């Protein structure tokens, strides 16, 4: 049944008029019957919502058919989604701005609200403060009403204040709001006196008979503007800032200086932006607030812009009255300004788009009065066709420019699209507490949404960040510090990206790796950003909101989804429901580096205990400024004990090789099989399935690539069952580190040295050893073995502990040697309680056989053992033994040599050995101890 409804939805997206109405009704009826038969409450609610959306669309389609004869403008979709209490509260809180209240729009004001009888003394006064810049204050002559400014009102009376000539030629003088005036210049074609004029629904009072704004008898004007998540009511009076000179402080029509409605629109907008000393914006943002049209910023200096497609879609929409176009320049020198005739970091209006032979042309207007005009230097235009004659071309400061020249000299192309291009709209409002710096590079705390479409019809998603007083404070502070260039960048950046996740529509941990990015939007310094895409029918996808350097602790946002077929949208859920985030730091003591260093075991470690079989996901991130290469390893370690020696078979899963800033490890199936970023290892401890880890306790090791790389981190762990995670104390916590008096070295023909070890009481200890190469790098590496031995008499000697054959290097080797199938294959579980850390465990006697020789440059370590002074006396002493084979003479001291100890174990620095213990240990001098 639902499949039939989806087919009607598909046809609905492709049809218009009565045909579209027929499919909307048919789909709604099917969903209604399906909802009645649904046994699952969740399915019933989903089907009822789809039915309600289609009924609302049908009502709009019927209303559109009735009004088609009287309206020249297509209907605008409205969000039919029911807001939560939290969302309604958010919108009310966002009404407060700059000491004013801008309530959500409720209804069109009655005409008598503007009567003289409704105001004291017949004149309404808005006491809201409007700030001015120092330059404006120098010539400010007070706030005056139109009849006070224009003492010589023409005979036709006050109507001249609202009556425009055939073409309006707007310009700014001492105003600082170039983007606002450019926006008004571009919007004039939609504000003109005609049926369907945008002004009829944006400015009050409005005279529907003559299709233009009306003069308010009491000086009150009400504007309907879109900002902070909804249409809002903006109230002003008719007083304008006047000047003591010939300069003007508000936008003026050069062809009719009496025309004031553009100046009133400007005043209303500057009221919501903080005053006439407006620090700056962009015209796409301004037009979105003034008209509600969808803003898109196209970056012209990128390599991936499709010129033909971009020109075609913009020109078509512009000619149909569905697009407003403006331009913005970037940074260049004063000399380039004079040469090109373009103002740097300035917004321009586009008044026309035209094809002229092989040239694609923009008619561009500089909103500044008496300012620079494009000189054409370096122009690629080849046509000499006369393009004069239109009213727009006769305006001041206008010039034609080819698309290629626009690409070369402008940074941004702003297009505001009519929402009437779409039939459906959903608005979602939310507050986001900005995560700490250590989590800025990952998405663990980012808002994410699941989007499901049953058709391939295009979807547009607009993210709007609500304005706050604190942002204006930041901009003004930067301006006082003379940081005039790109002031918006001090407010941070944001972006939208779309991902294919597993399971579909669930949250993702970070932008790279096992989650395939379908669309990644740029980070923009604007409060609006747009993502356009064509969905995969029937497959939920994940939308992620990201930010960089947003300076305030929290923000409110609105997501608006536009489409021509219904969408199912909800906050994305976690694929694993149990989560915990812990924070910590790599310090000088705990930044042990990668597995090639013996200090790897000093890295931060955590004991993770799972209560039942579960997949596992881990996300590690650092502060952006640190940009450290980081890694995660999950290891079997005999009940979550601290890892003291790493062997490959203990690896459960790990992240990809060291990645800067953040990384991710997971046993969940990947949605991006072409880009594997975490390793899942098979081992000999048993397993339950390809994605489940057996119940038990594991050790997590967090490392940077090099020892000594310090910085803060955040680790988020997720599982399908309850779990606990606790830090494992470092070996250095409450322990003594006793180095041997000197490195162990070997003379020619020697292969074994030893040093006596003494303890006064029962002591738990382990041995760490590392060779340091200071000799020739071409010498053959020697192999080393280190042990703690009881006694010296053959037959009675016992090896208490010996370094393992793998040492610190085996984990790295095991990761690099895993095949792709092994990385994607089954994950091991946990076996029985056998002891790790010393090879060749002898069951029952508590002693170990000697480990295999290994490259000590990777670091070697024994397991922990108990040193009992009584036992040591019985055996005749305890010895720290270092043995070497190979090396081609490395580390030897020959007769007569000035070198008193070469290196051993692969270099001239010898083997550096120390004992880590919970009690006092003494180590004697080295002596030769070759066995017979």
Swiss-Prot record:
Record EC number: 3.4.22.-
GO molecular function: calcium-dependent cysteine-type endopeptidase activity; cysteine-type endopeptidase activity
GO BP annotations, alphabetical order: proteolysis
InterPro entries xrefs: Calpain_cysteine_protease, Calpain_domain_III, Calpain_III, Calpain_III_sf, PalB/RIM13_Calpain-like, Papain-like_cys_pep_sf, Peptidase_C2_calpain_cat
Hydrolase among keywords: yes
Active site positions, chain numbering: 178, 346, 366
Stretches the record annotates as Disordered: 890-932
Residue ranges, compositional bias (Gly residues): 902-911
Keyword Hydrolase recorded: yes
Matches recorded under SUPFAM superfamilies: Calpain large subunit, middle domain (domain III) (SSF49758), Cysteine proteinases (SSF54001)
Protein role: Required for the proteolytic cleavage of the transcription factor pacc-1 in response to alkaline ambient pH.
Family: Belongs to the peptidase C2 family. PalB/RIM13 subfamily.
Protein name: Calpain-like protease palB/cpr-8
Species assigned in the record: Neurospora crassa (strain ATCC 24698 / 74-OR23-1A / CBS 708.71 / DSM 1257 / FGSC 987)
The organism's taxonomic lineage, starting at the top: Eukaryota, Fungi, Dikarya, Ascomycota, Pezizomycotina
Gene coding for it: cpr-8
């Amino acid at each position: 049944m639902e499949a039939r409804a989806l087919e009607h939805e598909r046809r609905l997206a492709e049809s218009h008029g009565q045909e579209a109405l027929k499919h909307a009704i048919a789909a709604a009826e099917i969903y209604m019957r399906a909802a009645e038969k649904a046994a699952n409450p969740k399915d019933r609610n989903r089907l009822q919502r789809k039915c309600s959306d289609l009924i609302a669309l049908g009502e709009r389609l019927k209303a559109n058919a009735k009004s088609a004869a009287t309206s020249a403008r297509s209907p605008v979709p409205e969000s039919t989604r029911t807001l939560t209490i939290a969302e309604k509260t958010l919108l009310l809180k966002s009404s407060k701005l700059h000491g004013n209240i801008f309530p959500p729009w409720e209804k069109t004001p009655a005409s008598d609200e503007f009567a003289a009888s409704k105001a004291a003394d017949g004149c309404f006064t808005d006491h809201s403060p409007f700030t001015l810049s120092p330059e404006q204050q120098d010539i400010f002559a007070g706030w005056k009403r139109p009849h006070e400014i224009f003492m010589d009102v023409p005979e036709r009376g006050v109507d001249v204040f609202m009556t425009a000539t055939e073409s309006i030629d707007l310009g700014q003088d001492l105003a600082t709001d170039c983007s606002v005036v450019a926006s008004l210049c571009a919007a004039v074609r939609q504000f003109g006196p005609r049926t369907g004029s945008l002004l009829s629904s944006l400015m009050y009072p409005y005279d529907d008979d003559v299709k233009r704004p009306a003069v308010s008898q009491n000086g009150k004007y009400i504007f309907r503007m879109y900002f902070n998540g909804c249409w809002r009511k903006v109230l002003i009076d008719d007083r304008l800032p006047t000047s003591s000179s010939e300069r003007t402080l508000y936008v003026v029509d050069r062809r009719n200086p009496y025309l004031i409605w553009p100046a009133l629109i400007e005043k209303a907008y500057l009221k919501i932006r903080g005053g006439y000393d407006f620090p700056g914006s962009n015209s796409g943002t301004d037009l979105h607030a003034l008209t509600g049209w969808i803003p898109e910023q196209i970056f012209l200096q990128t390599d991936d812009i499709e010129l033909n497609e971009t020109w075609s879609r913009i020109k078509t929409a512009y000619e149909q009255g569905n697009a407003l176009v403006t331009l913005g320049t970037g940074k260049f020198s004063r000399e380039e300004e004079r040469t090109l005739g373009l103002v740097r970091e300035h917004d321009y209006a586009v008044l026309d788009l035209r094809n002229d032979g092989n040239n694609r042309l923009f008619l561009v207007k500089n909103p500044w009065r008496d300012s620079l005009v494009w000189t054409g230097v370096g122009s690629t235009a080849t046509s000499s066709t006369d393009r004069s004659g239109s009213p727009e071309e006769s305006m001041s400061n206008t010039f034609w420019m080819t698309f290629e020249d626009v690409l070369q000299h402008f940074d941004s192309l702003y297009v505001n699209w009519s929402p009437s291009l779409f039939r459906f709209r959903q608005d979602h409002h939310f507050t986001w507490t900005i995560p700490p710096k250590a989590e800025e590079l990952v998405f663990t705390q980012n808002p994410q949404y699941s989007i499901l479409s049953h058709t391939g019809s295009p979807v547009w998603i607009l993210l709007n960040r609500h304005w706050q007083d604190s942002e204006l404070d930041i901009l003004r502070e930067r301006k006082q510090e003379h940081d005039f260039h790109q002031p918006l960048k001090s407010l941070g950046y944001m972006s939208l990206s779309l991902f294919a996740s597993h399971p579909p529509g669930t949250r993702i941990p970070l932008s790279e790796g096992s989650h395939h990015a379908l669309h990644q939007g740029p980070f923009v310094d604007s409060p609006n950003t747009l993502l356009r895409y064509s969905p995969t029918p029937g497959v939920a996808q994940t939308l992620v909101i990201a930010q960089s350097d947003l300076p305030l602790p929290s923000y409110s946002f609105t997501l608006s989804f536009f489409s021509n077929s219904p969408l199912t949208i909800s906050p994305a859920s976690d694929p694993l429901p149990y989560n915990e985030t812990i924070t910590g730091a790599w310090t000088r003591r705990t930044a042990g580096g990668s597995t090639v260093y013996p200090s790897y075991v000093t890295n931060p470690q955590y004991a993770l205990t799972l209560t039942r079989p579960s997949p596992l996901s881990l996300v590690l991130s650092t502060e952006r400024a640190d940009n450290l290469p980081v890694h995660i390893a999950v290891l079997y370690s005999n009940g979550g004990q601290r890892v003291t020696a790493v062997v490959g078979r203990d690896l459960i899963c790990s992240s990809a090789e060291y990645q800067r800033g953040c990384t991710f490890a997971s046993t969940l199936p990947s949605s991006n099989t072409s880009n594997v970023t975490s390793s899942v290892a098979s081992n000999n401890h048993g397993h339950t399935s390809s994605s489940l880890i057996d119940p038990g306790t594991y050790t997590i090791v967090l490392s940077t690539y090099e020892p000594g790389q310090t910085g803060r981190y955040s680790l988020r762990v997720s599982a399908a069952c309850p779990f606990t995670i606790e830090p494992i104390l470092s070996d250095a916590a409450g322990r003594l580190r006793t180095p041997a008096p000197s490195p162990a070295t070997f003379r020619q023909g020697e292969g074994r040295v030893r040093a006596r070890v003494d303890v006064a009481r029962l002591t738990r200890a382990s041995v760490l050893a590392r060779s340091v190469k200071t000799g020739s790098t071409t010498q053959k590496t020697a192999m080393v073995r280190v042990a703690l031995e009881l006694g010296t008499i053959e037959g009675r000697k016992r090896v208490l502990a010996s370094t393992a054959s793998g040492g610190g290097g085996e984990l790295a080797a095991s990761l690099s040697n895993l095949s792709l199938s092994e990385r994607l294959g089954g994950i091991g579980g946990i076996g029985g309680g056998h002891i790790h850390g010393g090879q060749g465990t002898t069951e029952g006697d508590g002693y170990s056989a000697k480990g295999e020789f290994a490259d000590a440059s990777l670091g070697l370590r024994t397991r922990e053992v108990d040193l009992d002074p009584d036992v040591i006396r019985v055996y005749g002493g305890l010895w720290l033994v270092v043995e070497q084979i190979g090396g081609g003479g490395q580390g030897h001291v020959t007769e007569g040599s000035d070198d008193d100890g070469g290196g051993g174990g692969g270099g001239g620095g010898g083997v550096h050995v120390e004992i880590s213990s919970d009690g006092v240990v003494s180590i004697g001098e080295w002596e030769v101890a070759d066995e017979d």
